[in-house]
Amino acid sequence: MAKPLVTIVGRPNVGKSTLFNKLAGKRVSIVEDTPGVTRDRIYAESEWVGKKFTIIDTGGIEPENNDIILTQMRRQAQIAIEMSDVIIFMVDGKQGLTDTDNEVAIMLRKSKKPIVLVVNKIDKNVEENNIYEFYNLGIGDPVSISSSQGLGIGDMLDEVVNKFKSEGEDEEEEEYIKIAFVGKPNVGKSSLTNRILGEERVIVSDIPGTTRDAIDSFLETDFGKLVLIDTAGLRRKSRIKEEIERYSAVRTMAAIERCDVCTLILDATEPISEQDERIIGYAHENNKAILVIVNKWDLIEKDDKTMENFKKNLEMKFSFMAYAPFLFISAKTGQRVHKVLSEIKKCYDNYSKRIATGVLNDVISNAVLMKEPPVVAFKRLKIFYVTQTDIKPPTFIFFVNNPELLHFSYRRYLENKLRQSFDFEGTGIKMIFKERKN
């Protein structure tokens, strides 16, 4: 289940960035008294009573006007609101209710998202009675806090996490293989999605994603039940190019967290960018199955070494995830598109693979016989037994005499033996070394 997204919204200078920095545990947003200082949406991870979530700080929402920066901030806040699972609507208890607060409240009510109304700047110098006028917003019971002094934040977070969906609400989605097509704008995500949907012709339904604003396409295919998580709508004609990456970052992150198989789509005509590396790095860190698709292969002049050389370049760029397969396609012409779902299914099967304990220990025992662990600090690692404890990704616990005796090269050797024996192409694997207690 993906971490919920919580967005802090409100007009400028009510204290959103101060609260964001408290929740993020570090100073991420610039905090000044000048309206409009938080121009970009910024996000960070947070946790309360064991529940993890992503918190988003937005630029303040001003009434419509001709100021280009304020217009962009308002648009960005609207995108964040669309994506959110819960919205923290912050108002200023010292200044009181304003016309802009009422305008924001109207916009939030239209979103039909769970809202926690927070009255900030209620401290020793401001009476608690100041919160009552905010009932007029029609949002619900206000929660009073002082973000600068840290007062009332626990009560506010209790309200926030109580509005999260329970895990049971996502059970219907669990029977599907969740696939995210991610990548920079214009690499062909939309074309590939449309090509796959058009070829399969077995769409069950197009319904709003259960936890995000993207449209998820539910399919029943020869490869099982699939969900294509749509991140293709990141670019809209009304948005200038410079805004696209800012809008896409959180959506891409959310799609990766939801998916089982992260499919990075690259443009064969362009060099691999830092953005590509960040996207795939995030999928790797989140232990997702990964497939790399190189699109627009029809536009490349080729000889018998072109694909091999391209693969070598990719392997150097993505050396930290050598397990990921590559597929060269053209969404425009349909070249090799028929292989996309079968490759995704293979990655997923390996991602959710279980190995019998007996077979697993036979492989590791033989590996140790072929090559003993190196001596570290005059001692040698001894592996007593290994067991698989989880899937998605496959997770193995090795019970040993002393984990500190494990050399990184021997860890890599054991991983290679597991991969050679059980075919974990397309997925990372976790290897945990624990001391066996007598």
UniProtKB/Swiss-Prot annotation:
GO terms for molecular function: GTP binding; ribosome binding. Gene3D superfamilies: 3.30.300.20, P-loop containing nucleotide triphosphate hydrolases. GO terms for biological process: ribosome biogenesis. InterPro entries: G_ENGA, GTP-bd, GTPase_Der, KH_dom-like, KH_dom-like_a/b, P-loop_NTPase, Small_GTP-bd. CDD domains: EngA1 (cd01894), EngA2 (cd01895). HAMAP family: GTPase_Der. This is GTPase Der. It comes from Clostridium acetobutylicum (strain ATCC 824 / DSM 792 / JCM 1419 / IAM 19013 / LMG 5710 / NBRC 13948 / NRRL B-527 / VKM B-1787 / 2291 / W).
